[in-house]
Design a protein with these regions (language model features):
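Alpha-helical transmembrane segments in multi-pass membrane proteins
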Residues: 12-65, 80-92, 111-116, 120, ...
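Aromatic-anchored segments of alpha-helical transmembrane domains
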Residues: 21-29, 90-99, 159-168, 210-222
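Functionally important transmembrane alpha-helices
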Residues: 24-29, 176-235
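Membrane-interface helix/loop boundary segments of multi-pass membrane proteins
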Residues: 130-157, 196-201
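C-terminal membrane module of polytopic membrane proteins
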Residues: 210-276
């Protein structure tokens, strides 16, 4: 364990890329093994199973790297960081209202299907944030997060690595390429903000991530209209401008006073790691 942690500090980029590869292989492998009848009964059931297994894989990587403390919950820090994520709360609420207002009001699905949808959205946030913030961002911060330029590198690199796997949605024609590109670019921006917001606390990014997905897919979950793939296909190129607010927010979160907090935290983590 000690040797693995030491190696991950020395070769953090290699380990970050390895974590991305492991996560992607798990994603593709599990997706192919899930029984097709589950998809026909409710598309969110296999999604829930997939993300539960991906979350377990992320926790396994955290355990190997000795970083399970990231999963600790702090009520004080949670409330403070949730306020910082106010933009995500607002755009999620706006998306929710717009989607419901424009929906063809059909029959609301049964409570069981609605529960699957809610749990699925939550587990998407858990699975992706544990791996991309908990594992990958932590690896990068531990090695490069001791300087201002290093923190910026971590934020940008983490955002890019988060955006890349979203391109998988174009495989096999599951979603239109234009929509997938828009989703990937947006994921880069939101990933940068989540990384700038995250340092040693993972639960706020998880909740905000789940909220954004819940709001964006509410019509599909509530009425059964379309799937995740059809929603992604509906994105148009002009929606790429949504990345601009993310860049502005990331810059604000990395202002001088905030940067000093991050530098202090990452330096403390490095000092602790050297004694383990």
């Amino acid at each position: 364990m000690y040797r693995l942690r030491t190696a991950s500090q020395k070769y953090s980029i290699v380990f970050a890329l390895l974590a991305l590869v492991i996560w992607t292989v798990l994603l593709l492998g599990i997706s192919m093994l899930l029984p097709y009848p589950l998809l026909r009964w409710d598309p969110y059931l296999p999604q829930l199973l997939l993300d539960t297994l991906l979350a377990a894989g992320g926790i396994g990587m955290l355990s190997l790297l000795g970083d399970l403390s990231i999963l600790r919950f702090s009520g004080k820090q949670f409330g403070k960081r949730l306020l910082v994520g106010g933009y995500f709360l607002l755009i999620g609420a706006s998306s929710l209202i717009q989607n419901l207002a424009s929906a063809d009001r059909g029959t609301i699905r049964s409570p069981g299907h609605l529960l699957l949808f809610v749990l699925s959205m939550l587990m998407i946030g858990v699975a992706e944030e544990i791996t991309f913030r908990g594992v990958i961002a932590t690896l990068l911060f531990r090695r490069y997060g001791k300087t201002t330029s290093g923190v910026w590198f971590c934020v940008i690199a983490s955002g890019i690595l988060f955006g890349c796997p979203h391109l998988i949605n174009a495989i096999g024609g599951g979603s239109a390429l234009t929509g997938v590109l828009v989703q990937a670019v947006s994921a880069v921006g939101s990933g940068m903000v989540f990384t700038a917001m995250y340092y040693r606390t993972i639960w706020v990014p998880i909740l905000l991530h789940a909220w954004i997905d819940f709001a964006g897919l509410i019509v599909s979950g509530l009425y059964g209209e379309g799937t995740i793939g059809t929603v992604i296909s509906s994105y148009s190129l002009w929606q790429m401008v949504s990345v601009l607010p993310y860049l502005i927010i990331a810059a604000y979160l990395l202002r001088d006073t905030k940067m000093q907090e991050i530098l202090q935290t990452t330096k403390s983590d490095s000092a602790l790691s050297s004694t383990i």
